[in-house]
């Protein structure tokens, strides 16, 4: 028995793209053969899934896509109260895959049949014990030895041969070959023939056109051309009130996130990766306390860059530039959203906004009972006929962005399709000191959108409608 790996995912792969394991086995043509794929939490006996697969038509390979299973094991990380850094264990799942196989417990013989005390003895390695019911199939389908064909009982057995309850005197040709199997079609199961260990599925989804060229080396932060786990453009405009929580896949241990502003001043925050993925707040409103002289952002700073630093004197990731947007706004709402690679970025909505409320209620008509006084029926003017209950209030907002670049407009699609979105309002004191409300979960109401191109529209802005996920309570 041997297996060959035909294909497997890369060790670090997004959970929302195909994660196919394809195996070949030398036993694939055996009767009742199936591949067994077992999936475990890495390094443990905690089995999260098991699949038995028939060989593919044509090549006989065993193929299993584990993406649906692993999607149930990843979620997202977000801590809006932290401005330092934190490990992001919910954004990834470590797993092992062990591939085995099963087949019908079938044994063949080619040696001559032997007389064993008047009964037929067959020479073949086997696992039978006395009393087992077996089915014998001869090469000639029982033409020469019809009494040996079919269902019989084992009356003696060793690991090398076995005897069945068939009189040897009925045998006319001792040279006929054949096979024998348990009457209940018992299977032989062999597990852990091929093992894949310490694979990582992270909360990510690549576009159809991008997935075929995906390489995990693009996201392992070791060189200046490596990317964080985000699709946020390398140049991105943010207001002073915006938050960014970006994920990265760095080496474990003590590292630095370096900030350099347009005046050339350099700052950093130390991180200590204990997990495969870390989340780092890097937005203008949430970069936190940095080591350096002065402040990262003041009235003279137009932009700042942020990158990952591991090796002394080296740049270990792309530089992500944050251009500071100081355009005065009528009112500002910021929407924080989960992007396609598991980071939380945000867009500011600085132009006119409209807040609307919707009330739903149940109304029923009740009989006015009134009262009897002085042998006359009467009622109070406060008595109610129509009554209402189950009153619910929901809030929605129409929001409009300011002008943005084409790259930002394309990235905006990820906000519109994000399953996790949060909104906050921002006010500015003297234009430079933002004060924010707390984040509230919301739902994007837009069901269609246009992807703008600058060749068709020089000035690009977006409009959306959101609805708060939670309703205010109404007393009765």
Per-range role (PLM):
Residues 104-110, 114, 358-361:
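Internal, charge-rich low-complexity segments
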Residues 88-90, 157, 299, 392, ...:
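Surface-exposed coil/turn segments at beta-strand junctions on protein surfaces, enriched
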Residues 130-131, 170-174, 246, 276-278, ...:
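A short local loop/turn or secondary-structure capping micro-motif enriched for an aromatic residue
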Residues 109-133, 137-185:
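Small/polar beta-strand repeat architecture
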Residues 1-108, 183-326:
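Preference for solvent-exposed, low-hydrophobicity sequence contexts
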Residues 2-5, 271-272, 297, 313-476:
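Extracellular/virion structural assembly segments
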Residues 125, 249-253, 404:
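Short solvent-exposed strand-capping/beta-turn motif centered on an Asx-Ser/Thr pair
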Residues 36, 96, 121, 133-135, ...:
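Beta-strand secondary-structure signal
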């Amino acid at each position: 028995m041997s297996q060959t790996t035909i294909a497997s995912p890369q060790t670090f792969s997004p959970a929302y793209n195909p994660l196919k394991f394809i195996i070949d086995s030398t036993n694939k043509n055996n009767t009742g053969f199936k591949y067994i794929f077992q999936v475990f939490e890495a390094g443990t006996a905690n089995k999260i899934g098991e699949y038995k697969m028939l060989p593919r038509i044509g090549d006989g390979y065993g193929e299993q896509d584990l993406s649906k299973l692993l999607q149930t094991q990843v979620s997202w990380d977000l801590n809006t109260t932290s401005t330092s850094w934190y490990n992001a264990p919910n954004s990834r799942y470590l797993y092992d895959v062990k591939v085995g196989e099963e087949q019908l417990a079938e044994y063949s013989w080619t040696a001559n049949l032997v007389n064993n005390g008047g009964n037929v003895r067959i020479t073949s390695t086997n696992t039978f014990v006395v009393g087992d019911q077996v089915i014998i199939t001869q090469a000639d389908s029982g033409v020469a030895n019809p009494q040996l064909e079919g269902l019989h009982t084992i009356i003696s057995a060793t690991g090398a041969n076995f005897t069945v309850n068939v009189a040897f005197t009925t045998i006319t040709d001792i040279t006929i070959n054949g096979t024998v199997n348990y009457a209940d079609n018992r299977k032989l199961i062999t597990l852990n023939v091929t093992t894949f260990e310490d694979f990582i599925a992270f909360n990510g989804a690549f576009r159809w056109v991008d997935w075929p060229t995906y390489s995990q080396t693009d996201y392992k932060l070791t060189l200046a051309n490596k990317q964080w786990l985000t699709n946020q453009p390398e140049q991105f405009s943010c207001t002073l009130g915006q938050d960014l929580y970006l994920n990265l896949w760095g080496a474990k241990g003590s590292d630095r996130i370096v900030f350099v502003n347009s005046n050339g001043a350099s700052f950093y925050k130390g991180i200590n990766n204990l997990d495969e993925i870390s989340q780092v707040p890097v937005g203008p409103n949430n970069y936190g306390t940095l080591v350096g002289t002065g402040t990262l952002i003041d009235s003279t700073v137009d932009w700042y860059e942020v990158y990952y630093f591991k090796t002394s004197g080296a740049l270990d990731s792309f530089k992500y530039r944050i251009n500071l947007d100081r355009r005065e706004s009528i009112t500002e709402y910021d929407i924080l959203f989960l992007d396609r690679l598991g980071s939380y970025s945000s867009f500011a909505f600085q132009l006119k906004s409209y807040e609307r409320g919707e009330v739903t209620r149940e109304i029923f008509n009740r009989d006015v009972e009134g009262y009897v006084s002085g042998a006359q029926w009467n009622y109070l003017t406060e008595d109610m006929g129509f009554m209402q209950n189950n009153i619910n209030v929901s809030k929605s907002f129409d929001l409009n962005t300011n002008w943005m670049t084409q790259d930002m407009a394309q990235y905006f699609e990820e906000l519109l399709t994000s399953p996790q979105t949060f909104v906050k309002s921002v006010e500015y004191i003297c234009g430079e000191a933002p004060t924010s409300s707390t984040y509230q979960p919301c739902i994007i109401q837009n069901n269609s959108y246009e992807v703008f191109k600058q060749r068709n529209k020089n000035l690009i802005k977006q409009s959306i409608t959101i609805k708060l996920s939670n309703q205010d309570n109404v007393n009765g």
